[in-house]
From Swiss-Prot:
Record-level GO cellular component terms: cytoplasm; membrane; ruffle membrane
Domain notes per entry: Rho-GAP domain is able to regulate RhoGTPase activity, actin cytoskeleton and cell spreading. However N-terminally BAR domain plays an autoinhibitory role.
Protein name, entry field: Rho GTPase-activating protein 45
GO molecular function, one term: zinc ion binding
Basic and acidic residues bias locations: 414-423, 434-444, 573-588
Source organism of this protein record: Xenopus laevis
Residue stretches making up the F-BAR domain: 261-524
InterPro entries from the UniProt entry: AH/BAR_dom_sf, C1-like_sf, F_BAR, FCH_dom, GMIP/FCHO2-like_FCH, PE/DAG-bd, RHG29_45_N, Rho_GTPase_activation_prot
Residues under site feature: Arginine finger: 766
Renumbered zinc finger spans (Phorbol-ester/DAG-type): 671-716
Positions in coiled-coil regions: 103-132, 363-485
């Protein structure tokens, strides 16, 4: 019975199926094959395993990546037969991006389509249950074809050799090899489907990023020259076998991958297999105990270190920050903060490991493991005891049977001899012998029956032991798998926590290192000396002092003293005094002095005031201003000069930012009036909380770290900054309708900055920006909106932000409903020639080809269905791309290249299934064709009728818009559209001075100075309405005869009071026809009067504002 059971075990489905798909020849008889012939190697099965121990203890290389672990296969060693490339491709530099020829794109997309077909075929073969015995070799063959095609693509384009791609490939290989083709298991099907979808999505995203020039260099496999174990050749080369190579993935899966069946069969066949499994389970429990003890003690050490580090930081934090203006003080302050945060992170991670992720699950699993192991062991020992009892009874029965048989044989012999000797003896003796023989026979038969019963019982117990053995081995395997699962999740969580805990350290140390390199020697000492604000040391004079009587003879008489003492007289070393000035000083000391109650204002360079009439004021009256007064004076001076000269910069830059003026500030940070942070807030630059060493703006309430002021990109809007706006991934219409021109401000700002600085930059929109800077720019746009300052941002980062915004729209700029029509139109345009490239797109005017012209007309009709805001934005964006393509000789960005980049960003199919996204890559040439057509035939597709009003006011409106946006310091907001025309204004009649009433005297500010010859005139002016602080009404201007009054006084030598009066500094010129600078122009400023609560100006070239 035992032998029959053994034969049944040998004929299990797994072994029979494996033998039917087994190796056709031993490994030594295999001929050497090239690495590219991977389909035959994948289709073939491994050679017969004669030593399961050796195959079960395979050692992987130390440089094994996570894709090999996921695949469950060993990679070939450097001494293997796999082909090695001559050089290892290195990731591209940050400044140069990958370029691919337009001709190669179609070939690449063809390979992608074939790869998608191989994956579809592999899925059909694996899921087809009708194939039965041929499913395994066919699946291996399909997998080999897909991997061979994938390797060819990666060899041709090394930038596709990413960790994610190889990880997905390794996972797919392991799922195909470990699939149970004999029995349909739902878990295997789900795992296989998930691996297939992951492979398709990963390869699709990698191809998309490669075509758009956005391959992240951090995901590339940068291999040392001697280590090729993480390449695609190693992944496929390890599968093809050969001399000196490790066993293939198929061998590994069949020898150690079929954990469910092969391991049990091996242990069932081997002597002492259950004892070995129980011993392994016992050792595993001990291993879990030692491992948890190690992690616990290590966690305790880290907690002690964290507590000691926090204690050290708290002890020295106040000491190091006590003195100001010390070298590297900000660096070490940041380092202390990082150490404090690191200590908090260590304590948090330790508590998490103790109670959630590692120690508690491992200890609970170890206890359960021990309990189950003892139960299984008791079950096995109980079955063994039953078999031993049956075998003992069998031995006793066999001995009794032999003894009774021998006695029966002896009795039978005695009875036979008694019959022969019957003549010599009596019948009584013969009967006695016969009865003895009969009793011996009965006892022998009874012993034989007992013996047979014991044999049957022993066989039964043996069979039960075999059944218990199978059950015990299965339970032990499940127990070990469960423990492995818990240990794997705990290990992953542990090292992920360690990574999250230690990852910020190198970044922080690198930041501190780079900041330390920027320190200039003696910088803080110089800052310390400058902030002292020390008064000049007074000159000490040693002069003769005459004796003064102590007794005053008359209380009404006292000595007359000079207004200035000897210390107030400037020394000859600092100031040379002419003889005339000394005479004036002596007269001022002895003679009569005239005291005034107001200060005398003297303008430098005033020709009407000579140096002789200027009194020599003592130096004590010229003390330097305090830092705050100096800052205010500089700010007022700068504002005055800009207002007088009519200059309005694109960015308001303050001269000082309070207590943070001595650190390096970005251009946007200089626009804020900063003070020390009073309450904890969230930093608008790094999006983390600010507790200490923070700054906030007095006007817009922006909060920021002190270290983040160097990179701040949000300008001051002179009003409270709004909360964070969800910008990326938001519906396009919601963002577009917030702008007056229905174009999102992000698109307009990025495009304007790129057109200003990067139209001739090589590879614009193709070279990838730095990922961290791009994320910071996106965050700045969401925090600051239109106030983001982009003059210091890299153009490649700006292009990345623009593409990222377009790609993350829930519905693309060209809606889903137009996608099929556009793709059909593109396919129709490419179907014209034999090569599949279609006619060349070229705008020849009236001589344009008929086919091309029909495509353009159909495209124009399709775009008529776009919503207004989508069409406006698309037109604006395509116009910008036209300007970029006009510089093709310098930036290498032709319309076709721009189509490749912006095709997937402007249009995409409606999302359905993951595998469809891989097939949609075939539409890339069609998307690029549509965008290329839009760029080349922009004037035809987006042509609009131009009215006379638009011609007359278009330029002025755009100029007014730019001027209004650049004048941020006046705090003026636009209330109406700048292109709107203002109504007519009727200028009232100015009254005669004699006829002015009391009311007019109280309301007119100097109106009596206006000549009575001015007449009312009706003027029509295209004025822009502005929301002022004092009044929102429109300001008329005065023309005609009043202007001649200013022209008649142009030749007078006396300067206009408006040039020196700060009350006139807001009278700013709005026309730019004067080519002479304002400070050289001798034209007097026009008169400005206020009557009846309104401002009247005598020239349309001036626009006053209240400040």
């Amino acid at each position: 019975m035992f032998s029959r059971k053994k034969r049944e075990l040998m004929k299990t489905p797994s072994l029979s199926k494996k033998s039917r798909a087994g190796s056709p020849a031993p490994q030594n008889d295999l001929t050497r094959k090239d690495v590219t012939d991977s389909s035959n190697d994948l289709a073939s099965s491994p050679p017969s395993n004669s030593s399961p121990v050796s195959s079960g203890t395979l050692k992987r290389p130390s440089s094994l990546s996570r894709h090999a672990s996921a695949a469950g296969i060993p990679l070939s060693s450097p001494r293997g037969k796999a082909t090695k490339p001559a050089s290892t491709p290195s990731p591209p530099e940050s400044g140069e991006g990958p370029f691919i020829d337009v001709e190669d794109i179609s070939q690449l997309l063809g390979d992608v389509a074939r790869f998608a077909e191989r994956l579809e075929k592999l899925r059909d073969v694996v899921q087809d249950e009708e194939l039965k015995e041929t499913r395994r070799p066919l699946a291996h063959e399909c997998l080999g074809e897909a991997l061979r095609l994938l390797r060819q693509v990666i060899n041709k384009y090394p930038l596709l050799n990413t960790v994610e791609t190889l990880t997905a490939a390794g996972t797919l290989i392991s799922k195909v090899k470990g699939f149970h083709y004999e029995s349909s298991i739902e878990n295997d099907k789900r795992d296989f489907e998930k691996a297939l979808e992951s492979m398709a999505v990963c390869f699709s995203s990698t191809i998309s990023e490669f075509l758009m020039g956005e391959v992240d260099s951090s995901t590339l496999l940068s291999l040392p020259p001697g280590d090729q174990s993480q390449s695609m050749e190693s992944l496929c080369g390890g599968l093809s076998g050969g001399e000196g190579a490790l066993p293939s993935a198929h061998e590994y899966v069949e020898a150690g991958g079929h954990l469910g069946e092969d391991v049990d069969v091996i242990l069932q066949r081997s002597d002492g297999g259950v004892q070995a499994a129980l011993l392994y389970a016992k050792n595993m429990a001990k291993y879990l105990k030692d491992l948890s003890s190690y992690i616990e003690k290590r966690t305790i050490l880290e907690m002690e270190y964290a507590k000691g580090l926090q204690k050290l930081v708290n002890a020295y934090k106040g000491t190091l920050n006590q003195e100001t203006h010390m070298p590297f003080q900000s660096i070490y302050s940041v380092a202390l903060e990082q150490d404090l945060e690191h200590g908090h992170g260590i304590l948090h991670t330790a508590l998490t490991l103790q109670h959630q992720t590692f120690l508690q699950p491992i200890n609970m699993r170890r206890q359960e493991h021990e309990k189950r192991r003892k139960e299984v062991k008791e079950q096995w020992q109980r079955a063994q005891r039953k078999l031993m009892e049956a075998e003992s009874n069998l031995r006793k029965a066999r001995q009794a049977y032999m003894q009774r048989s021998e006695e029966h044989e002896r009795a039978l012999y005695n009875a036979t001899r008694a019959e022969e000797e019957q003549s010599h003896s009596g019948t009584r003796s013969l009967d006695k012998k016969r009865r003895a023989e009969e009793e011996a026979k009965n006892r022998a038969e009874e012993a034989m029956a007992t013996y047979r019963t014991c044999i049957a019982d022993a066989k039964t117990q043996k069979q039960e032991l075999e059944d218990v053995k199978v059950n015990v081995l299965r339970q032990l395997q499940e127990l070990i798998k469960q423990s492995d699962q818990i240990l794997r999740s705990a290990t992953i969580s542990y090292y992920q926590s360690m990574h999250m805990q230690t990852a910020p350290l190198p970044v922080g140390f690198q930041m501190l290192c780079e900041s330390s390199k920027l320190y200039d020697l003696g910088q803080q000492y110089a800052s310390y000396v400058r902030q002292l604000g020390a008064v000049n040391e007074p000159e000490t004079s040693y002069d003769f002092q005459p004796y003064t009587p102590q007794i005053t003879w008359s209380p009404c008489i006292r000595a007359r003293k000079s207004s200035f003492n000897s210390q107030d007289i400037p020394s000859s070393e600092n100031k040379e005094i002419s003889g005339e000035e000394r005479g004036v000083e002596r007269r001022g000391g002895r003679g009569h002095q005239v005291h005034k109650s107001w200060p005398t204002a003297i303008t430098e360079g005033d020709p009407a005031v000579s140096s002789a009439t200027v009194p020599a004021f003592p130096e004590k009256l010229h003390q330097p201003l305090s830092p705050t007064e100096n800052v205010d004076q500089k700010r007022l001076s700068a504002s005055f000069e800009q207002s007088i000269n009519g200059l309005s910069g694109s960015l308001e830059v303050q001269n000082s930012t309070g207590p943070f003026r001595n650190i390096g500030l970005s251009r946007a940070a200089l626009t804020h009036r900063l003070r020390k942070l009073r309450t904890p807030s969230k930093c608008r630059e790094c999006n983390s909380y600010v507790y200490f060493q923070g700054a906030e703006c007095e006007e817009c309430s922006l909060a920021c770290h002190k270290k983040c002021l160097e990179t701040l990109a949000i300008q001051c809007g002179h009003k409270k900054l709004q909360g964070r706006l969800l910008l990326f991934g938001r519906d396009f219409s919601e963002t577009a309708l917030r702008s007056p021109d229905h174009i999102p401000f992000l698109i307009r700002k990025c495009v304007s900055e790129i057109e200003e600085r990067a139209l001739i930059m090589k590879g614009i929109y193709r070279v990838n920006g730095v990922k961290t800077r791009v994320e910071k720019l996106c965050q700045a746009f969401e925090n600051g909106k239109e106030l983001v300052e982009l003059s210091q941002a890299s153009p490649h980062d700006l292009s990345n932000v623009l593409k990222l915004y377009l790609r993350q729209l829930p519905e693309p700029l060209i809606p889903f409903r137009l996608y099929n029509g556009l793709m059909g139109l593109a396919k129709e345009s490419l179907r014209g020639t034999e090569t599949g490239k279609g006619p060349r797109l070229q705008d020849k005017g009236p001589n344009t080809e008929t086919d091309v012209l029909s495509i353009v007309v159909q495209l124009k009709e399709l775009l008529q269905d776009l919503p207004s805001e989508n069409r406006t934005t698309l037109q604006y964006l395509v116009k910008h791309l036209c300007r970029v393509s006009e510089q093709e000789q310098l930036n290498k960005m032709s319309p076709s290249n721009l189509g490749i980049v912006f095709g997937p960003a402007l249009m995409r199919p409606r999302p359905t299934d993951a595998t469809v996204s891989l097939s949609s890559l075939v539409d890339y040439p069609h998307q690029a064709r549509i965008v290329e057509t839009l760029i080349i035939f922009y004037s035809t597709i987006f042509q609009e009728p131009v009215s006379n009003t638009d011609i007359g006011t278009g330029n002025s409106s755009s100029d007014d818009t730019a001027s209004m946006q650049s004048r941020a310091r006046l705090q003026v907001t636009v209330e109406e559209d700048l292109s709107e025309l203002t109504p007519e204004y009727q200028i009232p009649v100015f009254k005669e001075p004699g006829a002015s009433t009391v009311e007019s005297d109280s309301e007119s500010d100097g109106a009596e100075d206006i000549p009575g010859t001015w007449k009312p005139q009706t003027t029509r002016g295209h004025l822009t309405k502005e929301a002022s602080v004092t009044s929102a009404e429109d300001i008329p201007y005065i023309e005609g005869e009043a202007q001649s009054e200013s022209e008649e006084d142009r030749d007078q030598t006396q300067e206009n009071l408006a040039e020196n009066n700060t009350n006139q500094s807001n009278n700013v010129a709005v026309n730019g026809h004067c080519c002479v600078p304002h400070f050289h122009c001798h034209t007097q400023l026009p008169a400005i009067r206020m009557m009846h609560g309104k401002i009247y100006v005598s020239s349309a070239d001036r626009r006053p504002h209240f400040v």
